[in-house]
Structure formats: C-alpha cells, structure tokens
Swiss-Prot record:
HAMAP family: 16SrRNA_methyltr_H (MF_01007). Its EC number is 2.1.1.199. It catalyses: cytidine(1402) in 16S rRNA + S-adenosyl-L-methionine = N(4)-methylcytidine(1402) in 16S rRNA + S-adenosyl-L-homocysteine + H(+). Belongs to the methyltransferase superfamily. RsmH family. GO terms for biological process: rRNA base methylation. It comes from Clostridium perfringens (strain 13 / Type A). Specifically methylates the N4 position of cytidine in position 1402 (C1402) of 16S rRNA. GO terms for molecular function: rRNA (cytosine-N4-)-methyltransferase activity. The lineage of its organism: Bacteria, Bacillati, Bacillota, Clostridia, Eubacteriales. NCBIfam families: 16S rRNA (cytosine(1402)-N(4))-methyltransferase RsmH (TIGR00006). This is Ribosomal RNA small subunit methyltransferase H. Disulfide bonds: none annotated. It is an enzyme of class 2 (transferase).
Length: 310
C-alpha cells in the first residue's frame, strides 16, 4: 500500500518554525514527510534536517520522497530518544523541533495495521512493528480493572466499565483476535441510544488501546523537556496534538517552562530563582482553517502550540 498522508496545519507549522536556511531542524514524527519536505525545501546545503519515525514504512516512503536532498538524516526511533540521538550525532543545538502526534492517514487506512475500527484486521496498533507488545495482548491479557482504567483514562469513555466487562466475558469463550470482533463487543456494551449519538462507538476505546500500546502519553513531557535542552536560543518547538489528553500535557509542560517560578503569589519578588526557559508564541492553540477542514476532515481536532527558547 502506498504511504499517503495529508499533513495537518502545514503552512502554520512552517511559519511557526521560523526557518533559517542554514539551521538544523528536527521532525520528530516523519509520517508521510509532508512537513519535512516543506522544511528541507527552505534549507540551503548548509542546513540540516533530522527525521525520526518508529515506523519503517514511513521511513522508507519518506526516503523515496526526499531522495534528492542530501542534507537529511533518517532515524528509526521513537522521538523520546531525541536528546541521546542528537548527542550521538554530535549535535549540541538545533533551531527547530516539530512534533505531529497524530496517527498517519496511511496507518489508519492500512487495514493490516489494526488502527482502524472501520476495517477488519488483526489486533495490532503498533507504531513500531518491531515491538512485541500489541493491542492483542492488552485485549486478551489485561485484567478487567486494567482495561477499565485505560479505557476510562485514555479514552475518556463513560461506558468504560461496561466495555471492560464485556471484553473479559467474551474472551472467556475464545481470544479476541480482530478489530471488528472488538468493535462488535464494544457496540454490545454501549446502550443503543448512546450508539446512535456522537462519534463511532468504538472510537474512544480504540484510542485508549492505541495510546497504551505505544505509551504515547508517557513520553510527551519527557520529549519536550529533552528537546528544549537541545534548542538554540531563538529556536522554536511546534507540537500538533489531536485529543485533549495530549493537548493538556503539552499545554501544561509549555506553561511550566515559560513560568517556572514556585514562589507563593503573595511574595512581592521571586526568591526561588527559577527563570523561564521559553516564551509562549501562541497562548491559545492554532486550529485548522475552514479551507483545510473541507479537504482534510482529520484536521478537525488538531491543535498547534508553539514555544521559543530564551
């Protein structure tokens, strides 16, 4: 299957990075290389782009798309290793870091990857298929309490308890092996009235399982903190999120970096001596325009937040 992915908030991201032609930039989530291709077009031969992806399909497709550019370095790794990878490459400072936290259109549309609740496939959902831990293990081995916790916490699903209970009851007869098997179990757990309203009944549960498989939320804050350490003065970090859990982590981490003072509000002056490391470029997140929403509905939930290193 061809690796296709429509980049979200493309122009907004490029503007946010304030690209210098001789700068060093990091694209933490390569995907279909839409953002990367626009970054590298703006670089001279003295500039450099470092591109991460834990999905080998993405790296292969992007390598073909950007084969004419010799100033691109490809890294098969999760972006949580950003500090160590840059250090190993001999890079002390970069001028911009971009993180797109969404699942690519290719991963959603490629049935065999198991991300979609619209197509039948083995329960997988691994961003990095070299990892052994998949959605199958979660669905078939987690206790009812563990399933309830992740579906409630990561999916923000109000019927989490019923869904967890139905999963455990169904797997007593036989293991749950495919996405559509799981979808039918979720549908059975949710009252008919609720199924008829709002998004697809399996959307939140699939989101929760995907987050758990790939440990998505655990690594966001660490990556931001490690990435900021590598930003040059005036360098920027731009992050696109797609649901409230991610956005909350990014928002709060950015806020702590921009205002780290721990002194009580009644203190007339700061005595903790904790200085801001960054400034917020956008106090409110940037969202997709009406025009973008028309040709790319998946951008509807996207939010872009930006900081600049002081």
């Amino acid at each position: 299957m061809e690796f296709k992915h429509v980049s979200v908030l493309l122009d907004e991201c490029i503007n946010a990075l304030n690209i210098k032609e001789d700068g060093i930039y990091v694209d933490c989530t390569l995907g279909g290389a839409g953002h990367s291709s626009e970054i590298v077009k703006r670089l001279s031969s003295d500039g450099r782009l470092i591109r991460f992806d834990q999905d080998k399909d993405a790296l292969k497709a992007a390598g073909e798309r950007l084969k004419d550019y010799k100033n691109v370095t490809y890294v098969h790794s999760n972006f949580y290793a950003i500090y160590d990878v840059l250090t190993d490459l001999g890079i002390d400072g970069v001028d911009g870091i971009l993180m797109d936290l969404g699942v690519s259109s290719y991963q959603l549309d490629n049935g065999e990857r198991g991300f979609s609740y619209m197509q039948d496939a083995p329960l997988d959902m691994r961003m990095n298929r070299e990892n052994e831990f998949s959605a199958y293990e979660i669905v078939n081995t987690y206790s009812e309490e563990e399933l309830y916790r992740i579906i409630k916490e990561y999916g923000e699903e109000k019927f989490a308890k019923r869904i967890a209970s139905f999963i455990v009851k169904n797997r007593e007869e036989k293991n749950i092996e495919t996405t559509l098997e799981l979808v039918e179990i979720i549908k059975a757990a949710i009252p008919a009235k609720a199924r008829r309203e709002g998004p697809h009944p399996a959307k939140r549960t699939f989101q929760a399982i995907r987050i758990e498989v790939n440990k998505e939320l655990e690594i966001i804050s660490k990556t931001i903190l490690d990435g900021v350490k590598k930003l040059n003065k005036g360098g920027r970090m731009a992050i696109i999120t797609f649901h409230s859990l991610e956005d909350r982590i990014v928002k709060n981490t950015f806020k702590e970096l921009a205002n780290p003072c721990t002194c009580p509000s009644e203190f007339p002056v700061c005595v903790c001596n904790r200085k801001p490391e960054v400034k917020l470029i956008s106090r409110k997140p940037i969202e997709a325009s009406k025009e973008e929403l028309e040709f790319n509905p998946r951008s509807r939930s996207a939010k872009l937040r930006i900081i600049e290193k002081l």
